[in-house]
Amino acid sequence: MSSEDIIYDPQFKPVQGIYENRLRQFIDTGGDYHDLNLPKFYDKKRISLDHDHVKVWWYQVSFERGSSPVSPDKRPSWKSIIERDKKGELEFREANINQPFGPSWSTTWFKVKISLPEDWVKSNEQLLFQWDCSNEGIVIDPKTLIPVTAFSGGERTEYVLPKTSDGKHFFYIEAGNNGMFGCGAGSTINPPDDNRFFHLRKADIVWPDLDARALYIDFWMLGDAARELPGDSWQKHQARQLGNAVMNLFDPNDRSSVRKCRELLQREYFDSFLESSKVYEQGESQVLTNVYGIGNCHIDTAWLWPFAETRRKIVRSWSSQCTLMDRFPEYKFVASQAQQFKWLLEDHPEFFNKVLIPKIQQSQFFAVGGTWVENDTNIPSGESLARQFFFGQRFFLKHFGLKSKIFWLPDTFGYSSQMPQLCRLSGIDKFLTQKLSWNNINSFPHSTFNWAGIDGSQLLTHMPPGNTYTADSHFGDVLRTAKQNKTPEYYGSGLMLYGKGDGGGGPTEEMLQKMRRIRSMNNRNGNVIPKLQVGITVDEFYDDILKRTNQGHDLPTWSGELYFEFHRGTYTSQAQTKKLMRLSEIKLHDLEWIAAKTSVLYPDSYKYPSKQINELWENVLLCQFHDVLPGSCIEMVYKYEAVPMLHNVVKECTSLIDKTVQFLQSQSKADLVEMRTLTWSKPEKVSEECSLNGSYTSSVTGYDDYIVLANGKLKVIICKKTGVITSITDETLGVEYLDTEHGRNKLGANQFVIYDDKPLGWQAWDTELYSVNQYKYVTKPKKVQVSCNTKEKCAVEVIFQISEKCKIKSVISLNATAVTDAKLSKVDISTTVENWDARNKFLKVEFPVNIRNDFASYETQFGITKRPTHYNTSWDVAKFEVCHHKFADYSEYSKGVSILNDCKYGFSTHGNLMRLSLLRSPKAPDAHADMGTHEIKYAIYPHRGALSSDTVKLAHEFNYCFKYKLPKDIGMNFDDIISISGDENVILSNIKRGEDDSAVKSNYSLNPRDEQSIVVRVYESLGGESFASLNTTLNLKRIEKVDNLEMKVYKSLTATRDESNHAINRIPIKLRPFEIASFRLYF
């Protein structure tokens, strides 16, 4: 045996945990050994702010404390600042490192002048300017006013300097003094710190070592593979060993060792295309792709910042993405929300036309979604949701020549059961969200599926398995997207949405480089490392789903609403905004109704105000953004933007209606009649004395312990001791509708309850399950007295003192009713909460009813959603608080109770208890949310039999209560222009002029026609096939059933003359359950 056969140097098996943990040291810029590892070589040279090479001056835009932080003067246009500076009108002062800039929400402008060292210029290598002022900023070319790239403190700090022969650079930086997530004090979702300052940390020119920076990405992905791949894969262990081999090979005193390390990794673990877009063309083509990467940039239109700041976030984010597209040909980026595109066009037309439009034409930048904003779908009315698509899709068609095929709504708080139908009516057949991954009780069971609405319409739906729309393109993000797919038996691939989001930003160069490395590792090592594909479009991804699932027929189906098991408090937070939204929707309905009919009667002397109407709709739709209307924004959004905006909508609608009414009154000398905008309401004479002949009159009787209100149909007993309603009986039937003997509430109806409301986090968003059993009844009235006692109306006023400043005044009333309308008799309640000053309390009002059913019915947009009244399963438990619109109904076969309201959305029905949510008092992100005085109207409608069209129509009347005084002859003509007859459950909901009528001159017209038309929207309200007739005196030329966009014609219809009145044309229509239908009538 020779000495060579003797072991002199024994080897040990590496200890996995130790060797794995060691890998983090190599690229750690803040670790103890950063100067002995790769970070030492990230830069070849760096020069910080000095007087020879980098000079920076600053100018602070005037910002008076206490003034509106969203006024235009706080964010002056780029052009105005640069022109004024050129004229010497602005005083720019020299800036210094660590200098603070602020306060919160103010704007600071910087001028940057760079003179690169001669040897840097001669190198002809890529050079950088690195800027970090801890806030948001954007680089602006002073000659073209076109932005180049954006900065966000700590995340996006580098600007690639264009190559120049002399190394000279001059540009401006506009900086908004807020972080990417606003200015929250302590936590991002706390109320803002309005006195926050942002420090200039870096203003450096950098000569980077691109090899070292590339090795940083190589090693990062290799280390992630070592940490995150399954333990039974050889690729995991090889990654760990190679990582340690690289660290052993690296020499901190020899920069050339960087190249040697890269060469080792390319030989052993990556392919040769790891830095090229061609990497996605390599590998086994027969192997199915696990993960498809799509860049996106979710910009909340308002949230922890105002609309005014979002306008700047848009250009910052999208300019950065357009710059990246020039360097990464595979990069595809999607952005939604037509409102954001419109703001960009208004604020930066040069960028919109010269940069954005070409990127769209080159199929790198994609406008998706089809809605005006990424809207809430719980609270907006059905017509509002229809207009979200109408304006969104028409904007895209007008400016980009395309409409979206996908409803893009990754981040909203639940999805209405009518969304599939509204999407299909708007040219959309696909849907993407991921929010249900936030469910806090049940895990949603599907990733790819068909979502069917209550009418049967369905959308091909994908929920990215990575459970985020802001993936950083980490190895783990790709791995989770591949492994967390919940429907792999049907479709085994998933979409990964990568890019900084919520506050904007979007993908970074680093993310795109990481994805190239991950695909390179897959090309070399097989599918234990997921096969990642970048470069396809969202439409191509969905086409792949259809191809691999028998056109979607093999996929599972989810029917009904996509209820979000979280953020249930958003049905109630910011009550004033929700009330103004309801009022705005009603006023717009009335304006379109009266303006459309007036333009038909007087085409030569009255012009339909389409431009004003469209602008008002845009503002309403903007305020339906999924943080604004739900109530989860900071205070300034409501104080300075949304509330004033909605007040203005109501004011402008009222003004336009008044002008139209005055015009109509000038056209006739006939007596005036009062008209509503509901097709079943008939004109009433103005100031006509109420005739009580043939009516049940109202009366009030007082006793020692209680007060009785009665009108011959209903008898209502109010307890003087507690101030609540203890009995509601139908005297004609002998039926009691309340139950005070069983269940939790043995006191009575209109019982106010204050719940503790301390969710686990997310105050404005959440109310939690445990709060259901943590409550106190308000039982000691300060006053109970008769406030009205006439034959027309009787009422009792009840006052409760809640705190030293806060009191509740509730007026319970009963009106006289005609014998023929007695079945519609209801108990009206008007409640004023004065000086609501609670902290983390939730005010509700309860109604214990003598009803038993497993399900209750809640009005949703254009229909009904049924939900359980029991807690059988965890899915039932999760629905302890739900959303409704104008009514909730709880019925059994023989009788039922409907609760109507004029501005509330939260509700629950369990056991025998119906509960309407009134007010919350969260303290973040708005510290003053819902404080103050609130007026709320609701009603108890007891009825015989199950839910019927009586409830639907009463709820409409309860809300659409405005009356307009018109000459009698014109009023009759108004009624005859369009009406509906037939099945009572078919509702004629809206009337408007055709958008493409040339005479209308709409700014959203796409194909102007020299024709006149009105568009009529109807829907089936209760869930049954129905037949009705549209009746009109118009001299009809043709009739079309059209889509929501007024573009696609489904079919043509014919009209017949009414046999008893030949002036009337009757158009027979048939609707399936919960169908929404639009008809365009040409005349």
From Swiss-Prot:
The active site is at residue 411. Its cofactor is Zn(2+). Its EC number is 3.2.1.24. It is found in: Vacuole. The modification N-acetylserine is found at residue 2. The keyword Metal-binding applies. This is Alpha-mannosidase. The gene is AMS1.
